């Protein structure tokens, strides 16, 4: 089960898990909670903000402890790596990874129906078109390279955890217009 968490429904997370697992006794291997990425008219009403993102992290931790024997609670929040940094660094060493956290342009890309390639399904910035360019050319695009090398600005640029977190590039772009800007909802 996957659910997007916004400021509108953050207080319903626990009830959702309780209803599915405890009340309906449905066996769910993974319960995924995705952070809402503000865009367009929902920028004001759905955004979590710093306090909301911290609240989301705390709720995820609480749910993980409560349901540890019944389901796995996961999230795509890059900041979570900071709280498990020892384990994350061990994984990075084991698999020879330069960075983890936000996967935009690093662990994945998005190819839209018209061939437009973006660093992430939620980061609506074109880095090329697969119908006109090779994938290698697109992956060597300036934006893709800066994201991959974590050449970020603001708080994320100076953060000692940028290689294990990197903030959410889609959120940075949606709220500032710059995919390399700091994640404005970071609570660290």
Predicted regions: what is each one?
Residues 1-114, 118, 122, 126-127:
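Radical SAM enzyme [4Fe-4S]-AdoMet core and its adjacent flexible, acidic
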Residues 116-117, 121-188:
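Flexible mid-to-C-terminal extensions adjoining Fe-S/redox cofactors in radical SAM and related proteins
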């Amino acid at each position: 089960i996957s659910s997007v968490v916004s400021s509108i429904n953050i207080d319903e997370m626990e009830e959702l898990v309780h209803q599915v697992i405890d009340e309906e006794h449905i066996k769910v291997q993974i319960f995924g909670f995705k952070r809402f990425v503000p865009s367009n008219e929902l920028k004001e009403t759905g955004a979590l903000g710093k306090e909301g993102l911290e609240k989301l992290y705390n709720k995820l931790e609480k749910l993980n402890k409560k349901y540890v024997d019944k389901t796995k609670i996961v999230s795509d929040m890059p900041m979570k790596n900071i709280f498990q940094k020892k384990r994350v660094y061990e994984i990075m060493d084991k698999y020879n990874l330069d960075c983890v956290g936000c996967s935009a342009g690093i662990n994945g890309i998005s190819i839209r129906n018209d061939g437009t390639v973006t660093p992430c399904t939620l980061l609506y910035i074109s880095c090329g078109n697969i119908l006109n360019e090779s994938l290698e050319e697109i992956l060597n695009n300036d934006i893709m390279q800066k994201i991959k090398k974590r050449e970020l600005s603001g708080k994320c640029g100076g953060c000692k955890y940028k290689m294990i977190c990197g903030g959410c590039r889609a959120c940075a772009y949606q709220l500032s217009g710059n995919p390399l800007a700091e994640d404005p909802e970071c609570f660290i």
